[in-house]
Structures are given as structure tokens and as C-alpha cells.
Amino acid sequence: MKQKLALFFLLLTTFFVNGQILYSKAYGNIDSPAIIFIHGGPSGNSTLFEATTAQSLADKGFYVIVYDRRGEGRSIDSTATFTYQEAFNDLNKIYSIYKIEKANIIGHSFGGLVATLYSDKYPEKVKSLVLAGALFSQQDTYNHILKSVRQIYQIKNDSLMLKKVDEVEKLNRNSSEYRIGCFDLASKNDFFEMPHPTIKANNLRQEYKTSEFYKTNIRNSKAPVLFYKNEALNNIDTKPVLKRLKNKGVKLFAIYGQQDAIFSTSQINDMTRIVRKSNFLSIDNCSHYLFVDQQETFIKTIEKWIR
């Protein structure tokens, strides 16, 4: 009996594409409005969102689908190329497997780039696009990170780290080394951390760390390298694409943490103008992982926008 249940669970959460297994799972009623969550990366996964937020969002009356992109997280595939087209092909398969004609897509971090480009190519499949702490003008983000950390190290008179900033700035801007260098500096300075953790946020993170999801928090270190090797669109600005999407009938929304320090004020103003002020929310005491930092506000906002 246990073996049958295990097999049933496997069938629910994985499917084969080109001979490889992709992890996915649906939460909620299939007749409810569909939401597909696209995680960050390259080298990310959806375990944090799935463990903390997927079921809670489904409980509000949505059919929430999470998945790990090919070669990332639980979708182990040594032949993955990590291109956008590969991601699009697998996303189309998810639509087919879960019998979805049109979905609301939430794109988080790098997942926002995947979601934006997918929506541009297949607007007929996307009812609305929600950018959640999503990347959109990559070079502006890198410039902001480097400028910000330089100021921090100048105040601290940290000559060693100032030298590190100089080294990163000299790297090829279309390389994985440059991207990793920028985000490593951001991480060292807590750019992704909420400033004043709440009891709720702390509890969510602790529950995640003791869950089965955390045990499968797989990070493929080769993913960024292969993405930059195989994908020509590796440092892009999707603002023109987002403006075009509105003309294609895709509803646009954006939700960002006020203390998500990888985005400049200018970038946030740009995003607000694109989606319109009524479709934009900036959450206080919130950084990059806003669905954990301020989960209640995040879920209420999604419910309000795409109900």
C-alpha cells in the first residue's frame, strides 16, 4: 500500500519531457483560476515558495502550480542547456499536463525574465503577469549593486573589498563571473534580507528549514555558467517587452520589497510607470523574498489583483 501511495505521489509531482523528469506539483482546485509560479535562478528552485506559500495561496481559491526548471532544483537533467527557449518548451508542457489554456504567472527574481519573455511569445496563454521582486533591467541592477557596495566599503574604509569591487567591475558584463560577483557582493551586505524580521517570517523560514522541501533545496552551480554559455539574451532590459505586453492584452502587475536593495529608486519608478501605480505595490520591511518576508500582504495583493 505504501508503495502504491508513493507511486501516486510521484505521478502527481513529476512528468517526463524528452526522457527527463521535471518536478511539478499543483495545489488547490483544478477549476479555480490557475497560477503558475516561476522561480529565480539560474540554479534556483521553487522549494521556498512551495513550502511556505503555495498551499496558503491555493486556499484563497486558486489552482497553484509550482515547478523546477530543467536542470535546476529537483528537475535534475545533465543535458539541460538553460536557454529561455528550453524553459518555454517545458512551460508549455506544464500547460498541457495540467490542462490549462490560460494562466496567471508569478515571476520571482530571474523568473521574472523567464515569465516576461514567455508572455511576449505566448500572450494567448497568459491572463496576467505578476512581477514579484523580478529582474527586468539587469545592467541597471548590477550598476546599482556595485555603486551601493562601493559606498558601503568607502565608509568602512575597507580597501580589500574595494579592490574586490574594482575586480568585478572589470569583468565581462555578459559573463557568469560578473553576475555571480555582483550578487555575491549584494549577499555579503544583506541586500536580500528583510531589515526587521517578524515572528511570522522567522517561523516560516524555520519551518522551511526543518521540512522535507529544504532537504531538496538543490542548487546546480553549473546552471549560471551554462546559461551564459548557451543563451545570447544573458544581460537584458525587458522594459520595452513589458510595454509591448500591454498592447497584447496581458495584464501587468508588480510587487516589490521596499528594502530589496538590488533595485534602485529609478528602476522602481520605471516599473511603476510601466504597470501603472494602481497595479504596483511596494511593501515596507520587505526585501527580495517577499512571499516570506510579508506573506499576508503578498497573498492579499495577489488575491485582489487576479481574482
Predicted regions and their residues:
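Conserved hydrolase catalytic core segment
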Residues: E101-I145
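Conserved alpha/beta-hydrolase
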Residues: A58-R74
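Catalytic histidine-centered segment of alpha/beta-hydrolase-like enzymes
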Residues: C286-Q295
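The serine-hydrolase catalytic nucleophile loop
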Residues: P42-A54
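Glycine-rich "HGGG/HGxG" loop immediately N-terminal to the catalytic nucleophile
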Residues: T47, R69-Y84, D140
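Conserved acidic catalytic loop of the alpha/beta-hydrolase fold
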Residues: E86-A103
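Short beta-strand/loop motif that positions the catalytic acidic residue
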Residues: K248, A254-Y256
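Flexible "cap/lid" loop of the alpha/beta hydrolase fold
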Residues: L131-N174
